[in-house]
Every structure is written in C-alpha cells, then in structure tokens.
C-alpha cells in the first residue's frame, strides 16, 4: 500500500476549478494521452459511478479499464474509490479551499495494488505528484478563463 499527500496552489477560483473537476464527461480533455474512454454508469446527486479505459505509458504500455465511484462529500470535497481492476480498494480524497485568493487543492491517495502489479509502487511514488500537477494546472487555466456564470 502507498499513502501519499500532495498539495497544490492554483491560481483560479475554487468554485470554477471544482466545477471542471466534477465535469466527468470532459475529463479526457485533461488526460488526452491516458484516458481513452469514459462512461458514466450511474449518476445521483452525491455520487457518480464511472468506467474508464486508460492507457498507461510509463515503463509498461498497457490498456486497462476500471470502475470507480466518485462521491461528492461537500461543495469542495470528493472521495474516489476504485471498485475493480488492479488497484481495487484504492481511495483518493480531493479537497479544495481558498487561501489568499488562490485555490489550495489537497489530494490524499491510499493506493492498493494487486500482488501482480505491486512492482508499480515505486513508479507511482515517483510520477504521481507531477502527473497530478499537470492535470490540475490545465484545469486551473481553464477555470481562470471560464465565464463568470460557470
């Protein structure tokens, strides 16, 4: 198991950033080389279940799919649970808050890999922060450019 905490300072509105983050149908825009397909399986007021087809491009080049449940705990807090696949049982918590006119995005990862894929732990530890930073930076740029009603 790998547990990681990351914090990112983003130059955008918290509300607009969170709106983009929870616009699941458009997530592939921020992960064009990785997220090949995203299908919403079940949608409710406070949670959404999605299935993604992902292509990993690190040491191994492999496509896989996973289902995940994304629960909106509050207006600034998401909880993600991976329901199947090699990382079944992994949890990610994403929370945002405004601080000095910046959005602070805190991410807590609790990653559980199957025995077959445990060799990926060092890669995940090494690559995760920069991967998230790239995604969140793209989202914050779009949030900053978004219209006020967004």
Which positions does each model-derived feature cover?
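Hydrophobic ligand-binding cavity/cleft-lining segments
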Residues: 1-45
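Intrinsic-disorder/low-complexity, polar/charged segments enriched in Ser/Thr/Lys/Arg/Asp/Glu/Gln
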Residues: 1-7, 47-49, 65, 77, ...
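Hydrophobic/aromatic beta-strand elements that line small-molecule binding cavities or substrate pockets
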Residues: 6-8, 37-39, 65-71, 90-98
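Short strand-connecting beta-turns/loops that link adjacent beta-strands
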Residues: 13, 43-45, 75, 99-102
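Hydrophobic pocket/interface hotspot
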Residues: 16-21, 27, 50, 70, ...
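Short amphipathic alpha-helical signal-transduction/dimerization elements
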Residues: 25, 128, 132-147
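Glycine-rich portal/gate segments that line the openings of hydrophobic small-molecule binding cavities
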Residues: 39-83, 138-144, 150
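Beta-strand/loop substructures that line and gate deep hydrophobic ligand-binding cavities in soluble
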Residues: 82-133
């Amino acid at each position: 198991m790998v547990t990681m905490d990351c914090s990112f300072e983003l130059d955008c509105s918290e509300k607009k950033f969170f709106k983009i983050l929870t616009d699941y149908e458009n997530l592939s825009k921020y992960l064009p080389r990785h997220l090949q397909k995203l299908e919403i399986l079940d949608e409710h007021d406070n949670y959404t279940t999605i299935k993604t087809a992902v292509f990993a491009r690190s040491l191994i080049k492999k496509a896989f799919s996973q289902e995940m449940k994304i629960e909106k705990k509050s207006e600034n807090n998401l909880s993600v649970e991976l329901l199947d696949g090699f990382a079944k049982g992994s949890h990610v918590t994403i929370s945002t808050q405004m601080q000095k006119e910046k959005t602070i995005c805190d991410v807590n990862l609790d990653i559980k890999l199957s025995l077959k894929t445990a060799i990926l732990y060092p890669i995940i530890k090494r690559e995760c922060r920069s991967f998230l930073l790239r995604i969140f930076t793209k989202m914050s740029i779009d949030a900053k450019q978004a219209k006020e009603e967004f």
